[in-house]
Design a protein with these regions (language model features):
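N-terminal alpha/beta PP-like core and its mobile active-site loop of ThDP/TPP-dependent enzymes
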Residues: 2-128
Length: 128
């Protein structure tokens, strides 16, 4: 008789696993405190997923948009909450206008402080 051993995975690990399973090869990123767990998981999969470090969120989203436009595969940008998401909206707008495949993932505040004006909190549903 075998025992089922539960394996607890972090959200970041699950995200990296799913992106890898969907053959994502590049993520254009401005590292941020709100998604350190995901960054750790991407580093663990550095042979599968290459993190391309941008110096500004608008640059990351524009790189993702250009990647999508040039390859036909969704370009993926990952930025932090608040100002990071606001800056990244430039590339999202271009992708929307040009019908370019692009995905923007934004780190966010913890659920327990959401809708309580937490540091750099933005209502993304309204914003985007």
């Amino acid at each position: 008789m075998t025992k089922n051993k539960s394996v607890i995975k972090s959200g970041g690990s699950l995200l990296a696993e799913c992106l890898s399973a969907n053959r994502v090869k590049h993520i254009f990123v401005v590292p941020g405190e709100s998604f350190l767990g995901a960054l750790d998981a991407f580093v663990d999969r550095k042979d599968e997923i290459k993190l391309v470090n941008a110096r500004h969120e608008a640059g990351a989203s524009n790189m993702a948009e250009a990647y999508g436009k040039l390859t036909g595969k969704p370009g993926l940008a990952y930025v932090t909450r608040g100002p990071g998401a606001c800056h990244a909206s430039v590339g999202v707008h271009i992708a929307f206008q040009d019908s370019t495949p692009m995905i923007l993932i934004v780190g966010d505040v913890s659920r327990n402080v959401r809708d309580r004006e937490a540091f750099q909190e933005v209502d993304f549903k309204s914003f985007f």
